[in-house]
């Protein structure tokens, strides 16, 4: 355990009124942790097509290995998110300032 990270996690938990917190080294890791806590094999996530390349790879390839299906939609059509959803949808994923659009 990194003592600096441990202090950060304790302080964030205290600020948020939580019992614990997790600090990670990148946004991509944070995204992976969040999705893996929401979805399991057989579930799906509806995602924008406009993503950082590494995140797109994570969602499309790595999560598929865990049995989590990704459904990619055009973010220019907000209704596409609802249309792609079904009873197995556990989350919607989008980047507010996607890397390809910066």
Identify the residue ranges that each predicted region occupies:
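Conserved N-terminal alpha-helix of the aminotransferase class I/II PLP-enzyme fold
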Residues: 1-32, 54-62
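Short helix-loop-beta connector
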Residues: 15-19, 39-42, 87
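Buried hydrophobic positions in well-ordered alpha/beta secondary-structure cores of metabolic enzymes
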Residues: 12, 30, 45, 92-95
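PLP-dependent aminotransferase-class I/II
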Residues: 57-102
């Amino acid at each position: 355990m990194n003592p600096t990270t441990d202090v950060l996690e304790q302080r964030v938990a205290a600020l948020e009124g939580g019992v614990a917190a997790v600090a990670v080294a990148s946004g991509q890791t944070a995204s992976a942790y969040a999705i893996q806590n929401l979805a399991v094999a057989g579930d799906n996530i509806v995602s924008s097509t406009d993503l950082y390349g590494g995140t797109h790879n994570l969602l499309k390839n790595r999560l598929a290995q865990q049995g989590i299906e990704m459904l990619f939609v055009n973010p220019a059509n907000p209704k596409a998110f609802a249309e792609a959803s079904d009873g197995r949808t556990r989350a919607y994923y989008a980047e507010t300032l996607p890397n390809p659009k910066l």
